[in-house]
Amino acid sequence: MVSWWQALTRAAGRYPWPANVLLYAGFFSGGDALQQVLRGGPADWQHTRHVATVAVAFHANLNYVWLNLLERALPGRAPRTILAKVLCDQALGGPVYVSTFYAGMSILQGKDDIFLDMRQKFWNTYKSGLMYWPFVQLINFSLIPIRWRTAYTGLCGFLWATFLCFSQQEGDGTFKSAFTFRRIKVTNEVEKPSEK
């Protein structure tokens, strides 16, 4: 275990960008896999590949560049600086991440209107994100070293991706719809006739 951690630390020190991008994409894709397990039914590996593609091609790379730009523009860990970073991240970064997820997934799924999901779910998803991401980024900007910030965001993105992937497939972008889906799954399991 120690050698694995040492290898990861060396990789992040030598190649911080690719190491962070791969960790982010792995966590984000894992969130989609968890969402599929929670929904029940067969695994949809094509959907997970689409999520991984959006994460590697855009989200993780943008996140790495964005967090480094924020640190250059607003260096340090003073409380006012951290608050300014969180506000910038939510006001500027949040809308970009939500929009590109919905549009990117629609492109990869071959939908005719690649902006339909974004138009229908953007505001609800963005507002839901405001209940989660400011707290994540507050910890990120105050405690996490810059070289690990994208990986940390990916780790926290595991839970977010679970919600986001459900929302993209069936929900409306609200946390309430995610809880409703869980209740529907339990109800459907109760209604299924037992096989003998």
From Swiss-Prot:
Membrane found in the keyword field: yes
First-listed, main subcellular location of the protein, grouped into a coarse class: membrane
GO cellular component: cytoplasm; mitochondrion; peroxisomal membrane
Membrane-spanning intervals of the chain: 17-34, 51-67, 91-108, 151-167
Family the entry assigns: Belongs to the peroxisomal membrane protein PXMP2/4 family.
Function, as annotated: Participates in reactive oxygen species metabolism by up- or down-regulation of the genes of antioxidant enzymes. Protective against the mitochondrial apoptotic cascade.
Full protein name: Mpv17-like protein
Organism: Bos taurus
